[in-house]
Amino acid sequence: MESFRQIKNNNVDLISNNDPLDKNRLLIEDLWESVLREECPDDQAERLIQLKELSYSKQIDGNSSKTFKNEIVDIVNSMDLAESIAAARAFSLYFQLVNILEQRVEEDRYIQSFTNKDVQKSPDNLDPFAPALARQNAPVTFRELFYRLRKLNVPPGKLEELLQEMDIRLVFTAHPTEIVRHTIRHKQTRVANLLKKIQIEQFLTKDEKISLKTQLKEEVRLWWRTDELHQFKPSVLDEVDYSLHYFQQVLFNAMPQLRGRITEALTENYPDVQLPPESFCNFGSWVGSDRDGNPSVTPDITWRTACYQRQLMLDRYIVATSNLRDQLSVSMQWSQVSSSLLESLETDRVKFPEIYEARATRYRSEPYRLKLSYILEKLRLTQERNNLLADSGWKFDFEGEIDNKNIDKVENLYYKSVNEFTYDLELIKNSLISTDLTCDSVNNLLTQVHIFGFSLASLDIRQESTRHSDAIQELTNYLDLSVQYDQMSEEEKIKWLIDELNTKRPLIPSDVNWTKTTEETFSVFKMVKRLQQEFGSRICHSYVISMSHSASDLLEVLLLAKEMGLLDQDSQKSKLLVVPLFETVEDLQRAPEVMEKLFKLDFYKSLLPKVGESFKPLQELMLGYSDSNKDSGFVSSNWEIHRAQIALQNLSSRNNILLRLFHGRGGSVGRGGGPAYQAILAQPSGTLKGRIKITEQGEVLASKYSLPELALYNLETVTTAVIQNSLVNSRLDATPEWNQLMSRLAETSRSHYRKLVHENPDLLNFFQEVTPIEEISKLQISSRPARRKKGAKDLSSLRAIPWVFGWTQSRFLLPSWFGVGTALSAELNSDPQQIELLRVLHQRWPFFRMLISKVEMTLSKVDLEVARYYVDTLGSKENKDSFDNIFEVISKEYNLTKSLILEITGKNKLLESDRDLKSSVSLRNKTIIPLGFLQVSLLRRLRDQTRQPPISEFLIDKDESRRAYSRSELLRGALLTINGIAAGMRNTG
């Protein structure tokens, strides 16, 4: 049997001694094998190593051979439950180590690209962006971008105008596959740091190398002995804690560095251009505020989330301020101080006599240290109040509690807004400047305050549209209107809603016992009002309406906002930005019509926030990738979103309204995922104009934000793509011929996709039986149910995340490519010469190139031999014929799609032009196969016993009659394989 090292020696395409990624994979191989040999019984360790080596040696062109499959299956089926769980843990550990390694190498490459002063030069007669366009996975840095813009003669004024208006918002969301224990996360960080030290081996002595490798092995051994799974269903606040980890550990310090890098690049290429505002890139969150289909997200949870976020920021500011106090030891004996700072010290002395008494002697000639002592006290008092608010809840009578606790000093002396904190820091900064001093730590802290404030991230409320219409229906039933709300036409609803919005009298009686659902709908708006009163409008000012279908959906939310005091009729200002989310293909097509109705309403336009120097109204619109893909397939979803953006931007321009598009992208290709740089460049010309909002799904947070340089790389990539799209993408607009071709491809692919997914009566049974979807929905991995409606088993009730997740686990990855081959084939059958046009599109149109690139990457991860095993082993006998037919349809479409993708790209094999990606995918495809077979084995055992329930909870394994085991053990094993496959695929649902 070949080992990894033998393959390394025999296959130069797989590994290279000169490649840091390949070189360090050998370190991971040795580490993994060494840990298994020390932690597992000898025969078990050798069997696991044998499984992995089999994986390396017997795979053919991305699909496992049948002979190889049988060898793996024999080993897997010979394992008892304990051995199966050990195998699942071992392979999951392996992939997590590989992920850490790849992140470290990506981090190093980014550092090299940033520190390399030699920007790739382009001949003057060529497009300066051509090299980046040719290298599909090579985003540009700030330095490269501004150099190339200068070569294109982009005027400084045009660039400055864009930078001043630039508004990039990254919104973190929760995800059911990424609930990792803090303990495991910390171990991953320590492993990454040790790898970083080992990778600078040229500076290490022999003893240092040995010591580091020993530490690394011991860390992984501790990891192996640590329970990687939660023993309980994670709460929403657990998910909040998970997402905030990245802010606390990485992003807080990364943001000043991002500003430093754009400053340096502008200074080199556009020295006269004014820097963008510090907050040109900021953050939002749905974790703790997205209540669409998640009954666990209550008003109290959202309130506590806001308090938790403020607590985190106050903790960081206290540490930073304390460090500043240590650093700013400037003495009045040797330096002047501004009069403004001295005056503020006198004011603070009166307010904080205890601080003055305690610190005045020590800092009598060190005014900055004294000022920072006062700032620290204000921050601590703000923290004290925040703790009180978190404990009290959003409904509490705060004044009474504060008086009762005899801490009314908090009321007077804490920071009532982040502006007061900013003012104090600006006093210090300006005083230093006035005496010809600068302090990077002060500047960095101010940047952090401008970006994060006290809120850290804005909480977007999200709720499904029918919750509001149902509440208004219950209200109108109580009011006994002559025509009930649900009996009104859309035009009648709009008229009635506008009339009520213009009426000052309250509509909702205060003394009615509403149903629980309606009462909670009302309470959300009341809680938002209380949040804004306490935290400021920044903490929560966007209300996303999922499944938006009509203009009345938005007006209903505005009416409820008005009733709860979030809309000022006199000034015609709304404290909520109402954001429609158009998700299905039909809703995307209808979106321009819906928004046109609203833009024609003067009352509606007057409520839109006015932004920028132009003081134009701003409308935010969200586009859903997940449900449109689930509804109509990959090509149709992407094309309808593309078309909707153009139509909505044209509509907004005609109405003199600014548009901010909110892209609801998932981590997987089937939910809009993929490289952010290519995705942003592929947006239609003229639709960004420096403004974009994007979801960052929980499943991709670790790969993007776990390491400081990786976080900077992602932030710089997004920013450069937005600037590039906004300034130069107009030269890459599609022609009418291209648009017509794409419309035909979208329609044909949609028809073929829906024929299988929505029209084949056996597809749902196929999905439920041959993927782990039912087990996924039962596992303790998310606070959010897998289905929108409790107990429902139909496809429409299933959420997009588990839909994609199930297909990914079983190696079909169907939502990301099915229908593409049939659409391309139909086009070529009608005119074989169209292949040349398709190749031109692939070379010249970022949108089409992005589509083909995503399909190619996804196809490279499909393994039909493994998928076939899921069908044969998990499919019921009575469904064998229909399931075989479905598999044949899928297999035929896969082969057709693959052949046509290769023909368009001019390649012989998938990914052959991207060596790094090909190497990574090849390694994963090989090593992940045993996990798939392990998963099938565990699912088969579990389902066999479920069909014939035993008397007790403990089940006798027919392959292991000597011991009993419980359903919980089987579920545990299944969860370990699910997590392992998710880690191996690097994108899940």
From Swiss-Prot:
Pfam assignment, any one: PEPcase
Keywords in alphabetical order: Carbon dioxide fixation, Lyase, Magnesium
Domain of life, per lineage: Bacteria
Assigned GO CC terms: cytosol
Catalytic activity reported: oxaloacetate + phosphate = phosphoenolpyruvate + hydrogencarbonate
Enzyme class: lyase
GO molecular function, one term: magnesium ion binding
Record-listed E.C. numbers: 4.1.1.31
Required cofactor(s): Mg(2+)
Signal peptide start and end residues: none
Stored PROSITE patterns: PEPCASE_1, PEPCASE_2
GO BP, one annotated term: oxaloacetate metabolic process
Active site: H175, K630
Protein role: Forms oxaloacetate, a four-carbon dicarboxylic acid source for the tricarboxylic acid cycle.
Family per record: Belongs to the PEPCase type 1 family.
Protein name from the UniProt record: Phosphoenolpyruvate carboxylase
Underlying gene: ppc
